[in-house]
Design a protein with these regions (language model features):
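Conserved class I S-adenosyl-L-methionine
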Residues: 236-245
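Conserved SAM-binding motif I beta-strand of class I
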Residues: 260-265
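Non-catalytic substrate-recognition/targeting regions of SAM-dependent transferases
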Residues: 111-124, 143-219
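Mobile active-site "lid"/loop adjacent to the S-adenosyl-L-methionine
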Residues: 307-337
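Non-catalytic accessory regions of SAM-dependent methyltransferases
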Residues: 1-127
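C-terminal catalytic and target-recognition region of SAM-dependent MTase-like enzymes
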Residues: 333, 347-409
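S-adenosyl-L-methionine
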Residues: 269-311
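Conserved SAM-binding loop of SAM-dependent methyltransferases across substrates and taxa
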Residues: 246-259
Length: 409
């Protein structure tokens, strides 16, 4: 192996070599054939080579994780200085400016981990605030260099960035040996805002975002264009939005001209936020229910409520392979109940945000639910996550969101 650097070398087996050559950036602990005699420092850069010594890439070492190395480059001559990382940020931002509409750039995902070659890092923009989540030790160590560059690159493009807030209260950090925490990142020579709340506008709908306490980084940006698709179908219909969270699909449906929208969620806190968002947008064609969807749908069917468009956007029912079977039963139950509740000719929007609930499994589940409900599905659209959450071929973990629009006949 010939490189211009002198990093510790990890040799991997044929299985890992095949994955890496195919574009995947991870090296698992079990796929390492040999490693340096003196164990390198956690989070340091290491080179990865094949069984024959051919260079495969350079990445961050994680001694606590089963994912032992996360590649950041496949160029043996790269120099990983501040200029390198600045180019990476510029490249990611240029991509967003290309694939998103200008109005969407103030509420978008700026960095999507491995898909942007920042393994384990998420950066979301909410108006003038960047909210980050760091899930790898390599990115954690890089923060003093990388985070100021994030602000620098966006500001150089004329974007107003007032601060960077860290949402590292994620249990996955423990797998990297990292503590959970959240708070403002101290940009050199700057003070941060006092408030941890802001407002964004997406598809012409305003949302209050609590990026300190909201789920994940504060708001789910990946469904932005799917919400727009729902708004188009909703016009003139009576809509039930299950798992509404802070009301995003319901608000788009209401603004899109729905006759009436009911937004339902098991969380009273989420319903309160959805009501606040409805008031902010002056939407009066909305009702709100604090109820478990698994109980709500059978009750509404029994009572004969006249909804002709139902939206199912549940949280991930599975985050591991071992629970996929149970998750698919849950997905089938809510989809079956929705199909039974809808009149023939009604509409169904249904989604899954779990990578492990693959599109193949999801389609199979929908077929089974329709069969049991004695309904047939007329497909309108199959959609996915918004393009600021890019799907990197060879990395199936980046392809996680399934979204289907049907007419139920």
């Amino acid at each position: 192996m010939k490189t211009s650097r002198n990093y510790p070398v990890y040799k991997v087996n044929k299985h890992a070599e095949g994955l890496l050559v195919g574009g995947h950036p991870w090296v698992y602990e079990n796929d390492i054939q040999s490693s340096p005699e003196a164990e390198p420092e956690n989070g340091t850069l290491v080179d990865v080579v094949s069984t024959k010594g051919a260079y495969l890439g350079t990445g961050f070492l994680s001694l606590k994780s089963k994912i032992r190395v996360r590649l950041i480059s496949r160029n043996a001559n790269d120099t990983f200085d501040a200029a390198f990382w600045k180019r990476r940020v510029e490249y990611a931002w240029a991509y967003r400016k290309t694939v998103l509409e200008p109005a969407d750039l103030t509420a978008c995902r700026v960095i999507f981990g491995e898909a942007d070659q920042f393994p384990g890092l998420t950066v979301d923009r909410f108006s003038n605030i960047l909210v980050t989540q760091t899930l790898s030790v390599g990115m954690e160590k890089l923060k003093p260099i990388l985070f100021p560059l994030l602000a620098e690159v966006l500001r150089a493009d004329g974007q107003t960035i007032e601060g960077i807030y860290e949402r590292n209260d994620e249990a996955l950090r423990a797998k990297e040996g990292l503590a959970q925490n959240k708070g403002w990142f101290d940009l050199p020579g700057e003070t941060h805002p006092d408030s941890t709340q802001t407002e964004i506008c997406e598809n012409g709908v305003f949302y209050h975002v609590d990026f300190e306490n909201g789920q994940k980084t504060g708001f789910f940006l990946d469904q932005k264009y799917n919400r727009r698709a729902v708004a188009r179908i909703a016009a003139g219909h009576t809509v039930l939005d299950c798992f509404t969270h802070t009301g995003s699909f319901a608000l788009n449906a209401a603004k899109g001209g729905a006759a009436r929208v009911t937004a339902a969620d098991i969380s009273a806190e989420a319903i309160a936020m959805a009501q606040r968002n409805a008031q902010r947008n002056n939407l009066t064609n909305m009702d709100f229910l604090c109820e478990d969807t698994f109980e709500l749908l059978p009750r509404l069917e029994k009572e004969g409520h006249p909804y002709d468009f139902i939206i199912l956007d549940p949280p991930a029912f599975t985050k591991a392979r071992r629970t996929v079977e149970n998750a698919m039963r849950g997905y089938k139950e809510i989809n079956y109940r929705a199909m039974k509740l809808l009149p023939r000719g009604g509409y169904l929007a249904t989604a899954s945000c779990s990578h492990f609930a693959t599109e193949e499994l999801f389609i199979k589940m929908l077929h089974a639910a329709a069969k049991d409900a004695h309904r047939q599905l007329r497909q309108i659209e199959v959609r996915q996550q918004a393009p600021d959450h890019p799907i990197l071929w060879g990395v199936p973990e980046t392809n996680y969101l399934k979204f289907f629009l049907f007419q139920v006949i």
